[in-house]
Amino acid sequence: MTDPKTKSIYTVNKDGSTVTYTSAKNVKGTSLTIPSQIKLNGVTYKVTSIASNACKNKKNLKTVTISRNVTRIGSKAFYGCKKLTRVTLGKNVTSIGNSAFENCTSLKKVTIPSKVSKIGNRAFYNCSRLTSVTIQTKKLTSKKVGSKAFTRAGKQNYKKLVIKVPKGKRSAYRTLLKKKGVSSKASIK
């Protein structure tokens, strides 16, 4: 289904009351907001996920805001959005798919919300200008963070990469993040 206002495409999920943001084919602007709900054909749906490849290689996209109802970001959802500098993840996101933000080479700052329990392989791979990562979740383990999730993140200047983690998780997350590709030169606080 296509939203007539934004031209964004949504797919109704099996439950019939929620939708997945499927495509930004007609989005030409620099800013994108994934809404918490949309009204299509007179029916209001909650937007609960972003499909794989939904915004892949959108060359002009600079900022993305993901609403509170979204729980899942699909694989390669924002892959290769090279001008993307800022992403605001909704507080209810639980899963960030494989390569979701891979090669977003202008991304500078990201906050991983407290409900995230899974970060896929290469999720932030080659986000080379990343300087600030705030991890609010206490749920991450080696099995729930994919291979190379943070490899080459902040590679422009590893010494400027600051990763803030929850109190009581500094030691465990330092070990975990280094196994998943964070440079030993990055600061984990």
Give residue spans per PLM region.
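N-terminal low-complexity, Pro/Thr/Ser-rich intrinsically disordered segments
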Residues: M1-Y10
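Conserved functional micro-motifs across diverse proteins
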Residues: T20-T22
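Structural signature of tandem-repeat unit edges
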Residues: I9-G16, V27-S49, K59-R72, K82-S95, ...
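A structural signal for leucine-rich repeat
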Residues: Y125, G146-G154, T175-K180
